[in-house]
Amino acid sequence: MARFVALVLLGLLSLSGLDAIQRPPKIQVYSRHPPEDGKPNYLNCYVYGFHPPQIEIDLLKNGEKIKSEQSDLSFSKDWSFYLLSHAEFTPNSKDQYSCRVKHVTLEQPRIVKWDRDL
């Protein structure tokens, strides 16, 4: 019994140590469908591999925040977290779209531009 209690305590201590591990987010920005000027589409910003879970994600059009929806926070087997932020948009050759991410591991917000050719 004492051995079981010791193992449980050791497990809890190792889990509490997860807060000390900080991982910067990885960011992918892409459209749901191949882009066509003037045709409605969805812009996605997939942010993954980060820890701790507190994060702020904004989709931008020409540097200005646009209305978006976000998935529920989820975690991977390695206890890192991931989220998907998305918004409906109509691409054209004049506008520039990007994703801005703020996280404790980043000295300043990271902005990743959408490349319509990817």
Curated annotation (Swiss-Prot):
One of its GO terms (cellular component) is lysosomal membrane. GO terms for biological process: antigen processing and presentation of exogenous peptide antigen via MHC class II; antigen processing and presentation of peptide antigen via MHC class I; immune response; peptide antigen assembly with MHC class II protein complex; positive regulation of immune response; positive regulation of T cell activation. GO terms for molecular function: MHC class II protein complex binding; peptide antigen binding. Residues 1-20 form the signal peptide. Residues 25-112 form the Ig-like C1-type domain. Keywords: Disulfide bond, Immunity, Immunoglobulin domain, MHC I, Secreted, Signal. InterPro entries: B2Microglobulin, Ig-like_dom, Ig-like_dom_sf, Ig-like_fold, Ig/MHC_CS, Ig_C1-set, MHC/Immunoglobulin. Coiled coil: none annotated. Disulfide bonds join 45-99. It comes from the Eukaryota. Pfam families: C1-set (PF07654). The keyword RNA-binding does not apply. Belongs to the beta-2-microglobulin family. PANTHER family: BETA-2-MICROGLOBULIN, MHC CLASS II-RELATED. Component of the class I major histocompatibility complex (MHC). Involved in the presentation of peptide antigens to the immune system. This is Beta-2-microglobulin. The gene is B2M.
